[in-house]
Amino acid sequence: MSNYAIILAAGKGTRMKSDLPKVMHKVSGITMLEHVFRSVQAIEPSKIVTVIGHKAELVRDVLGDKSEFVMQTEQLGTGHAVMMAEEELATSKGHTLVIAGDTPLITGESLKNLIGFHVNHKNVATILTADAANPFGYGRIIRNSDDEVTKIVEQKDANDFEQQVKEINTGTYVFDNQSLFEALKDINTNNAQGEYYLTDVIGIFKEAGKKVGAYKLRDFDESLGVNDRVALATAEKVMRHRIARQHMVNGVTVVNPDSAYIDIDVEIGEESVIEPNVTLKGQTKIGKGTLLTNGSYLVDAQVGNDVTITNSMVEESIISDGVTVGPYAHIRPGTSLAKGVHIGNFVEVKGSQIGENTKAGHLTYIGNAEVGCDVNFGAGTITVNYDGQNKFKTEIGSNVFIGSNSTLIAPLEIGDNALTAAGSTITDNVPIDSIAIGRGRQVNKEGYANKKPHHPSQK
């Protein structure tokens, strides 16, 4: 039989105190909704229906055509939300997973096990449960003397005995699809919240003598529902440890997982070393044998093998094998560093292509430039690429020596094997094999210094 999934993503998330819908808040680089969607793929659903409401278009844009969508205009409870999927699913035969879009830590493995348990036990409904050290706020799983599930009681409706129960409802279920939509016709709002509880269908099934079961998670963390910024930070911490552990299993050294911030889609090759306080975001990819030292921050960067990045920032750039960057360098979007390039301390490179074995050791700005191989930038070199309105390009050939404190005013071309004298302001193109000198001639005025206040004769 087919599997289906309903993802509940209509809520505003008032306690988040945010303009964003709750499920749009990110954990380790992607939205909570995307985490849930990825995990749901493990059950190989024939159809996924996402229930949307608050700022629906934002939520719809995240999943695009990978899901069907239904609107819940009024948020009248979880049961009401599932009712919205009736037109999409009610006549289908199979098993339907119902899961909240704010549970980013649930794993695909657990959902697959839940479906398997449901099918093997021939249940009409199976509840995903967990044991909570502090169950306050959760619905409680009430069992009879034969350990069978009899009902789920919400916190506000629980009596003193029921509030002592540690087994909680995670808010994730599997149902026989047609039985689910039949039972939803019989639920009402006679409860403390005045809402349609999805949990009420469990009681309906029990009264009808249908089989209801519960599959208990081994790891309570997976059950975490994010309702506020505190829980969001908790989810982030758990996910970070999970991600770091997987990289370590794959052969990466993560010196201190507590301080490594690695987004879920980041790729890292074997034998690479991630020192403390490193942040790797977005679609960053790191090759083999690369060292990222304390404080490095990479966003959507493509980094090759045997690279060393020392306490530097790299954004949306390509760094080839054997490159060294930093300390305190900034590689800005649109930059490409070829093999063997060295970008040293306090160097900024923006929107530039730098050829093999070129070196900019210190205190340099290279912007909107195309640079050949084996070029040396002296300290203090500046490409002047902006006139206040437009950006201009600097083109530098191969085997060029740029003297210290050179100012290169674009648009400008410097030919192969050329040299600029230290302290020069270069405004015109420099031909191949030429030396360009663009500075005032030094004049020494002998004896003038003894008239100045600093001179010993004046003290």
Swiss-Prot record:
Region (N-acetyltransferase) location: 251-459
Alphabetical UniProt keywords: Acyltransferase, Cell shape, Cell wall biogenesis/degradation, Cytoplasm, Magnesium, Metal-binding, Multifunctional enzyme, Nucleotidyltransferase, Peptidoglycan synthesis, Repeat, Transferase
UniProt-listed SUPFAM superfamilies: Nucleotide-diphospho-sugar transferases, Trimeric LpxA-like enzymes
Organism in which the protein naturally occurs: Streptococcus agalactiae serotype III (strain NEM316)
High-level lineage: Bacteria, Bacillati, Bacillota, Bacilli, Lactobacillales
Pfam families, per the entry: Hexapep, NTP_transferase
Domain of life: Bacteria
First-tier enzyme category under EC: transferase
The name this protein goes by in its record: Bifunctional protein GlmU
Alphabetical GO biological process terms: cell morphogenesis; cell wall organization; lipid A biosynthetic process; peptidoglycan biosynthetic process; regulation of cell shape; UDP-N-acetylglucosamine biosynthetic process
Disulfide bond residue pairs: none
